[in-house]
Amino acid sequence: VKLKLPDDNATDASYPYKLVNPAAFSLFVPSKDRTPPNIAAPIPSVCVQIVQGDDDLLQSARDIKIRLCFSAWDPGYHGPDIFKPKGDGSGTYIQQYNEAAASYFVKNGEGWRDAWNFVDTALRLIENAEHLGDLRVIKEKGITFGPVTEQDAVPDFYPYWFAWAEFSIEETLTRNPKSYQHLL
């Protein structure tokens, strides 16, 4: 997935936006001044959070509910966002790279599609995975997802867009006190 890198000071055609792979964070998304040096910006990103864990002591299993928080930035259509049919009957589309495309910008509220394409890509990967590392995806619990809401309403953070997905994983619950006794 490649998404637009935000530039909070530019929302017109003069901004030659850059596409980047989203950053990944655990627990929280750091502020712009606290991002690691190799990360251009905290958005676009996915943040992995542990929501809840349950140990089944009789089955020696641990279920962990994971929440993925997705963020994207998109103030509107820039010229290179628009693809035109190639015109040779192949069904192929080509990206515009010309002077007219470079100066084209329409501010709109369609940037939510970037966040949802990001979510959809992650959902497909999770749905098709049996395991994530040595953790089993608990498919029988399903996946839930939605837009970020406040008091049951989707807040307007234009040009930033947010969504989430939750699923459960399982690991074998093993206790080996010798391996961590020295830490107690």
Could you say what each language-model-derived stretch is?
Residues 25, 33-34, 53-54, 73, ...:
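Short, internal active-site loops enriched in acidic
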Residues 176-180, 184:
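Mature extracytoplasmic or otherwise solvent-exposed domains
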Residues 109-172:
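Acidic-leaning, charged glycine-interspersed low-complexity segments
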Residues 1, 46-48, 66-68, 126, ...:
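Hydrophobic beta-strand residues in large extracellular and virion-surface proteins
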Residues 1-60, 183-184:
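Small/polar-rich, solvent-exposed N-terminal microdomains that initiate assembly or binding
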Residues 17-20, 38-43, 103-118, 158-160:
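Glycine-rich, flexible loop segments associated with nucleotide phosphate handling
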Residues 60-81, 85-109, 122, 157-175:
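Oligomerization/assembly interface segments of phage tail-like spikes and tubes
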Residues 1-10, 16-20, 74-76, 100, ...:
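Localized chelating/binding microdomains
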